[in-house]
Design a protein with these regions (language model features):
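Short, conserved sequence motifs used for protein processing/export or organelle targeting and
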Residues: 1-124
Length: 124
């Protein structure tokens, strides 16, 4: 809901192999482009530097949401729903909906291997 700044996220996590582990779903809110000062290698400051993929929030916490902490088999599907209030773009234009994306990934917490990741743009 763009007008209320409320973001509703529905995820479906499908496994295509039999695996054993401690799997977590992690969702980050990122700003695609932020123009802000940056100190350069030569010591000068570029006041209009374009920063890309700026981490802005962890939607479901640092370690995410537990998907499964035992064995999964080919065909297992896990569903999760989240809601998140987006920062107000009238006070910081970098939070305009067309500049926001979600990076979602599945991580095995014991060894921190990432099984799959996807970037979803929120605008357009």
């Amino acid at each position: 809901d763009v007008y209320k700044r409320q973001l509703f996220i529905h995820t479906e996590t499908s496994f295509y192999n039999t695996l054993s582990g401690n799997y977590h779903l992690i969702i980050y809110l990122i700003r695609n482009d932020v123009v802000s000062p940056q100190k350069m290698n030569d010591g000068t400051i570029d006041h209009h530097y374009h920063h890309h993929a700026v981490l802005s929030n962890n939607i479901n916490g640092t370690w995410g949401t537990l998907v499964n902490d035992s064995a999964v088999v080919n065909g297992d599907v896990f569903y999760h729903d989240f809601s998140f209030e987006l920062p107000d773009s009238s006070t910081d234009s970098t939070y305009e909906i067309n500049n926001l994306s979600l990076v979602t990934y599945i991580c095995e917490r014991n060894n921190f291997n990432i099984l799959q990741a996807i970037k979803t743009e929120l605008g357009n």
